[in-house]
Amino acid sequence: MAKDEDNSSVHLLDLPWEDVLVPHILRNLPLRHILSLQRVSKPFQSLVHLYLANCRHFDSTQLGSQLPKSTFSELLRNNTVLQKLDLQSCCDWLTDKELLPVIGQNHHLIHINLNSCGQLTRQSLVAISLSCPHLQNICLGHCEWVDCLSLRSLVDHCKCLEAIDLTACRQLKDDTISYLVQKSTRLKSLSLAVNANISDIAVEETAKNCRDLEHLDLTGCLRVKNDSIRTLAEYCTKLKSLKVKHCHNVTESSLGNLRKREVVLDVEPPLQRALVLLQDVVGFGPFINLQI
């Protein structure tokens, strides 16, 4: 009986690693829990290394600030199959030295998030353009090192771009954005927010070239005016959301048609806006009887 009991006992690590444990168990665990398994035993450490070498998605936000610079390169050292790379929570320390080896050996990346990674240089974006021909979505928000030449390199080599976030990339001007949208006509989402260099020229080029555009963020683009918003409404019939807060030259005369089409806008209609201001100034309650 004791012999039968010994033969029937199955341990977790007895299951097939590549066919069962990695794709069906580890893939469903938070990254921080997977990394903690390394402390259990050497076999578990080997299992985690196998997972890291074969994982398709690496999301540093799952670790928060717990991912030290010293271990980042080690974690992805043997991975050549990444499709999604989110390094937003590495923004305080990530440099070209850490990023370039990962980019250089992963040619299947589709989604990259480098939001606020301010210590990188244009060299990283050029490397992405040369190594990631299938790239569809890239976030470069608050990466002020992004310049005209590096963005043109990205556009020239990455023909499948559908979403790009250029929030606060203040080196970019109308001519560069025009080049982007002329080459990347499949764009569905674009952010040009917080860039005073952007004017009607870039917005109109976007409207005329990116007919499938669904989401556009122009927050804080002070030079954008009603004319380009009207052009946007005319050409981008699939538009779902538009952000124009703090665009002081954009008024209801251009937003009205979009509002009728139920495009989500981040500014209230004039009457509602006036009531909110009146409530703040006079101290009225939330309900106002307009018949008084």
UniProtKB/Swiss-Prot annotation:
One of its GO terms (biological process) is protein ubiquitination. Keywords: Cytoplasm, Leucine-rich repeat, Repeat, Ubl conjugation pathway. LRR repeats lie at residues 134-155, 160-181, 186-207, 212-233, 238-259. The keyword tRNA-binding does not apply. Pfam families: F-box (PF00646). Pathway: Protein modification; protein ubiquitination. It comes from the Eukaryota. InterPro entries: F-box_dom (IPR001810), Leu-rich_rpt_Cys-con_subtyp (IPR006553), LRR_dom_sf (IPR032675). Residues 12-59 form the F-box domain. Coiled coil: none annotated. The keyword Cytoplasm applies. Gene3D superfamilies: Ribonuclease Inhibitor. It is found in: Cytoplasm. GO terms for cellular component: cytoplasm; SCF ubiquitin ligase complex. Part of the SCF (SKP1-CUL1-F-box) E3 ubiquitin-protein ligase complex SCF(FBXL15). Substrate recognition component of a SCF (SKP1-CUL1-F-box protein) E3 ubiquitin-protein ligase complex which mediates the ubiquitination and subsequent proteasomal degradation of target proteins. Acts as a positive regulator of the BMP signaling pathway. Required for dorsal/ventral pattern formation. Belongs to the FBXL15 family. This is F-box/LRR-repeat protein 15. The gene is fbxl15.
